[in-house]
Amino acid sequence: MATERYNPRDAEPRWQHQWEAGKVFETKNDDPRDKYYVLEMFPYPSGRIHMGHVRNYTMGDVVARYKRARGFNVLHPMGWDAFGMPAENAAMERGVHPASWTYQNIASMKAQLKVMGLSLDWSREFATCDPEYYQRQQHLFLDFLEKGLVYRKQSKVNWDPVDNTVLANEQVIEGRGWRSGALVEQRELTQWFFRITDFSQDLLDALDTLDEWPEKVRLMQKNWIGRSEGLSVRWELDPATVPGEEKEVTVYTTRPDTLFGASFLAISADHPLARDAAAKNAEIEAFCEECRRAGTSLAALETAEKKGIDTGIRARHPFDPNWELPVYVANFVLMDYGTGAIFGCPSGDQRDLDFARKYDLPVVPVVMPKDADPQTFTIGDEAYDGDGVMINSRFLDGLSAEEAFETVASRLENDLLNGTPRAERKVNFRLRDWGISRQRYWGCPIPVIHCDDCGVVPVPKADLPVTLPPDVTFDKPGNPLDRHPTWRHVACPQCGKDARRETDTMDTFVDSSWYFTRFTAPWEDNPTDPKAANHWLPVDQYIGGIEHAILHLLYSRFFTRAMKATGHVALDEPFKGLFTQGMVVHETYSRGEGAQREWITPAEIRVEEVDGQRRAVHIETGEEVAIGSIEKMSKSKKNVVDPDDIIGSYGADTARFFVLSDSPPDRDVIWSEAGVEGAHRFVQRVWRLLTEAAERLRAVDAAPASGGEGLAVSQAAHRTLKAVEADYDKLAFNKAVARIYELVNAMAAPLTQVASGKADNALTAAVKDAAAILINLIAPMMPHLAEECWREIGGKGLIAERPWPKFDPALIVENEITLPVQINGKKRADLTIARDADQSAIESAVLALDAVKAALNGGRPKKIIVVPQRIVNVVV
């Protein structure tokens, strides 16, 4: 009888070696079985995996192992999203080349992932910084360019004068570069763009087909695409107030019904009217410059104080030339949305109301609730943006907002200003073309050449890849490619004269927008093998963080359409199923206050309970430290747990089991030492129960019981098998864990009976059948333990290669039913009884219940109402 504790340090490497030696997880494209493609968002090689990685990749691995067992040909690959800023920062700070830093990190993280026992097809591995990968990306760029999906234009950018690079809007914090802290400048640069807006309507409409995506993600993408139907209205300007030659300003609005509530117009700092006004007024010029520096990210616009400056320009109301409104430059109006000009209706929009109150502008209610009194309805601190009827709107009074929209649109479409209609209906999208130019070294080179005679010339495909020169220096800010003495100088492919390479590299989001396609045939000379891509795609289950809900997923959807347009794939949508997992979070620990606060790692802390109160003690000094909030694990607050430490102490299976067990997978899981220890105790319990009975289990063939002593354990095993199948299908891993705990509890006594030699052959055979089911159930989550237990009970081959067991329908039929029992209509008890019990048996059993006896107090009920298979009501 085996009684040794399970030793993951011995077992886990052994099984990992066996899987690898047998190429168990390598996938063949010509396998005739139904395909299943499961993919977790590939990692950036930062150097170490964290517990978030462990949770993400464990979830994907459970799906892969389960689907493999269910008979699918599973593709479960891994690669590295390897270009990007951190490698260049490391080069500047540590004097190490980005390539060296990146590939060293890949080697470290790959070793860590292998220790987790993931069933990955490593034969398809690549990094996006491999020339073999970005050669095919350059090929795609040239195909998109030929198809008209890529173009260049002058674009306003956020320029960091210290780092000498373009910053995304999100990287501008209160007007300063997120890294350098320098005041950001606005510059006009020629940038490369992908025409994602060509697909705006399709990207929006197709969201309705993605029924295996979270509704939250679909809504986020819908809002980001931002389709709106409105009216472009031309407002005549009072010529006496205009500093330049402009005679009118066009405003796009989705609420023309509120025109009579307008009290101001607001324009972007980059609007031609603003530039004209700024040229003649230093105060306006300074304000416009402040707006440009502040950043134009959604977060910046929504959180910044709403400010404006009166330009002195006056616009005439479209329905009343005697009514003039002031034109402000405002920091919340963007030049690249609509026309860069809006009208403000303070009564119907909170932002406009705040602005109007600040600058003492009129607030006229124009929509009120249907049951309100127009004589008394007013606007206080909050704008009214609900449905209702029009008031204070002349010929619109009494109409609904929808009717007023149509009335205004119809009138203005038929009203002429300077010989053309004053308004036209427009559909606008918030989505903008994707600017991919980055003034960085560590990215995919853009494969074009600039010739003074021929203009922009694509690099011939035969000359791809355009590789990054290795001999660059990072001793000064800016793009090393601009400074390279030879790399940028090249002969023009068309005329042969001296020319220059493009020194911008591609946004790293490009690299991750098609990698899932490359995994289908990473050895192919072209970007894809269309046959393989069309076979494997779409990805059946994609798993990753909610933070990628918009950009990465939207860009990938665009890329798939662009690749279809250029003949590389035959589908539109890359991901059939999407799952966004929660984070791994942990308590924070600290000592000191304010600027003196010092964060302390969990490894330095011992948590004690004194008089029912938890307290944290610094192990080395013995001093009590503050227990803070539970937050996402982060290096800055040091509330991180190193997966290597956990796996080293408890084994990979314990870590895997814990991150799946505590919370629904789409919610955060709180890391706790007690939780990990609990998972480890369960691992040891399963091992002990099975190995103590293993010798006798090996001596019999597995056979479920149809009656007798073994029936209960067979029913428990087969019912659990059916339920866990459904849980795995729905990615409800925490529910599967709970059921497996229950099954082990149900099996404990029979296993002990077998181990002690007190079970007959029929019971032993039933227990072996249940044990085989249990091992198969835990195999996706705890694959090493499953292999070890399978070997112990005499199983043949690898669990990783075994088909999923089938439940016996006869054993999952519930022979009993639980009925709620009411007394005078209020539930007082539950009755468990045979499903086929007749009315008389049910009544007798009900009368024997303690709650019913107490209510009757020795008497008889007036009547007992039995609703078959549903409920019992006792009337007393």
From Swiss-Prot:
Name the Pfam families for this protein: Anticodon_1 (PF08264), tRNA-synt_1 (PF00133), tRNA-synt_1_2 (PF13603), tRNA-synt_1g (PF09334)
Q: Which CDD domains match?
A: Anticodon_Ia_Leu_BEm (cd07958), LeuRS_core (cd00812)
Annotated GO biological processes are: leucyl-tRNA aminoacylation
Q: What is its EC number?
A: 6.1.1.4
Gene Ontology cellular component list: cytosol
Q: Which domain of life is it from?
A: Bacteria
Reaction equation(s) it catalyzes: tRNA(Leu) + L-leucine + ATP = L-leucyl-tRNA(Leu) + AMP + diphosphate
Map motif 'KMSKS' region onto the chain: 632-636
Cellular localization per UniProt: Cytoplasm
Q: Which residues bind ATP?
A: 635
| PROSITE patterns noted in UniProt | AA_TRNA_LIGASE_I (PS00178)
Q: Where is this motif: 'HIGH' region?
A: 43-53
Q: To which protein family does this belong?
A: Belongs to the class-I aminoacyl-tRNA synthetase family.
Q: What is this protein called?
A: Leucine--tRNA ligase
Q: Which organism is it from?
A: Rhizobium meliloti (strain 1021) (Ensifer meliloti)
